[in-house]
From Swiss-Prot:
Mg(2+) 1 binds at S48. GO terms for molecular function: adenosine kinase activity; ATP binding; deoxyadenosine kinase activity; metal ion binding. The modification Phosphotyrosine is found at Y76. The gene is Adk. Its cofactor is Mg(2+). Belongs to the carbohydrate kinase PfkB family. Monomer. GO terms for biological process: adenosine metabolic process; AMP salvage; circadian regulation of gene expression; dAMP salvage; dATP biosynthetic process; GMP salvage; positive regulation of cardiac muscle hypertrophy; positive regulation of T cell proliferation. It is an enzyme of class 2 (transferase). This is Adenosine kinase.
Length: 361
């Protein structure tokens, strides 16, 4: 064939060997509009909120959202844990656009339109399942000092349906294009069957499946769903509070975070070609990383405490930074360095927002 004589292959060699394709990173979760405000202790007490927690809204929180908007100076940001991480990863990757894919459910309303436009602005390839039974989900971020208490009203986010969205050929094709998958544990409360379908696909095709413990209540009240997916998890993320709750629920009988990481790393695993890695962040304290060989502590970047504006999204940003390097098969130390960098940028700004370009080398 004449085509074989054309000097096309040569041109390819000049390009970076790790050139990324669109949709290389896949995320699925709860798309929420964050409504954040600096509040006082009285407000937290009134709604019996802990200063640093993530919970799902109950009946007693019905008035919270209205009161937050009326009483305090609020800011609206496109949020939702996994969606935040996809945006940060895409920001760190820069080119190509749409390297990160995101699936989730929204309502057909103003907030839904905001989420769509914000995802497009961030160059994330978002494919929402849109339905009109529930409005787009919101998350109240109640900030006091360096703490944030999150109250999520999932609404539409809770309506994601595997058979109505994930299973559709055009959507599943995007799953097949990815090399790395990330789902926040929060999504186990919505569609565990969707999480399992993606996790199994990753294991069968020797691709990297990553999950976040997300919040203490996931390990407590969604233990069965969490442990059903755990054998498929190649990289597990979490913070120190989530790690402690997970250890207690699993009967690890230790409060030492390194030991918790080691025991979690050793839990049963389906794809034996990949050793599990467990990564626990601890705010300003060292990030703990357990691999098959050892447990290591990585110090975070020195941060002037006065510069910290809003720690909401720091964990999501860490994951986003980490994944941005993982898709290019960078070593673990580089992935962690990128995670620490991204988190350090995000905590100096309100919401999970970032400047135009990263300064990471």
């Amino acid at each position: 064939m004449a085509a074989a004589d054309e000097p096309k292959p040569k041109k390819l060699k000049v390009e970076a060997p790790e050139a990324l394709s669109e949709n290389v990173l896949f995320g699925m979760g709860n798309p929420l509009l964050d409504i954040s405000a600096v509040v006082d202790k009285d407000f937290l007490d009134k709604y019996s909120l802990k200063p640093n927690d993530q919970i799902l809204a109950e009946d007693k929180h019905k008035e919270l959202f209205d009161e937050l908007v009326k009483k305090f100076k609020v800011e609206y940001h496109a949020g939702g844990s996994t969606q935040n991480s996809m945006k940060v990863a895409q920001w760190m990757i820069q080119e190509p656009h749409r390297a990160a894919t995101f699936f989730g459910c929204i309502g057909i309303d103003k907030f839904g339109e905001i989420l769509k436009s914000k995802a497009a602005d961030a160059h994330v390839d978002a494919h929402y399942y849109e339905q009109n039974e529930q409005p787009t989900g919101t998350c109240a971020a109640c900030i006091t000092g360096g703490n944030r208490s999150l109250v999520a009203n999932l609404a539409a986010a809770n309506c994601y349906k595997k058979e109505k969205h994930l299973d559709l050929e055009n959507n599943w094709m995007l799953v097949e294009k990815a090399r790395v998958y990330y789902i926040a544990g929060f999504f186990l409360t919505v569609s565990p069957e969707s999480v399992l379908k993606v996790a199994r696909y990753a294991a069968e095709n020797n691709r990297t499946f990553t999950l976040n413990l997300s919040a203490p209540f996931i390990s407590q009240f969604f233990k069965e769903a969490l442990m059903e997916v755990m054998p498929y998890v190649d990289i597990l993320f979490g913070n120190e509070t989530e790690a402690a709750t997970f250890a207690r629920e699993q009967g690890f009988e230790t409060k030492d975070i390194k030991e918790i990481a080691r025991k979690t790393q050793a839990l049963p695993k389906v794809n034996s070609k990949r050793q599990r890695t467990v990564i626990f962040t601890q705010g300003r304290d060292d990030t703990i990383v357990a691999t098959g060989n050892d447990v290591t502590a990585f110090p975070v970047l020195d941060q002037n405490q006065e510069e910290i504006v809003d720690t909401n999204g720091a964990g999501d940003a860490f994951v986003g930074g980490f994944l941005s390097q993982l898709v290019s098969n960078k070593p673990l130390t580089e992935c962690i360095r990128a995670g620490h960098y991204a988190a350090s940028v995000i905590i100096r700004r309100t919401g999970c927002t970032f400047p135009e370009k990263p300064d990471f080398h």
